[in-house]
Amino acid sequence: MNAKKDNQYYGKYFEYLVACILNKELPCLSAEQWGVAGEDGLVIKKEAHEVATFLGPHRCFHTGLHTGNADADLVLDDGQTIELKRVSSGSGTYYNTSIYHMMKYGFDFKDYLREFGLYDALKENFSDLSISEKNNSPVSMADSSKIRHQFATIYTEKICPIDAAARSAFVQDLRKHFIENLDDFYCFVSDMLYKQSLTSHKKKPDRIIVYNYKKHTISEINLAEIITNLSTYSCQNTDTDFSLLAGPLRFVFSWQNGCGLNNPTIRTFLR
């Protein structure tokens, strides 16, 4: 159940049902209207009942139904903001923002793309497309899709290795900088925890509720404890070239729409 491509729709339907159950309302929109297929809708309804019971007797406002840039998914009648995660493992993405936030610490990702020859490789192999060295993304979303689906072999052999080398060097330099400059490191971790970047200003939720649909378990992440212990974290090595660790946090430097092509990001995960 629940292929990766369906996660967004299934997750939103899950939020919607939790809100309906808390508010003692019948759902106005069917599972099919949310893009949820077959018996999956019945399964998600059962899961939503479990989470609503976990949250207790509250009314709520479903912020996710009204804006895609909300600070949380639900606001309870006592003012608590709730972020809901429906996952097969881990706890889902806590925060997603532009990699260009790192310019705050003197690191411009475009310098690495230029140094390792990504722009040159794109121009050489896709001369009929618009390649930008000024924009944050080398190509548009539409062209990214075209490259990945119509020219998969060229993309895999000519572009992906250059991006991997550039990102690896970027993250290694960041790690070295943060180890040598702890104030910058703690500032960065705080920015991600409080969801405050140069390009995206949100608010952290009061509570994060995680439903694991494979294990059928509910857990709550203690965000306050993570923040309290912030000064005890160190910048650690990881098992990949593209991420940093800080205590229970993992920061992954990747791309939203095709590696080396469109929307380079920082994703924050709580372990």
Protein language model annotation of sequence segments:
Residues 1-72, 76-80, 85-271:
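Short, positively charged
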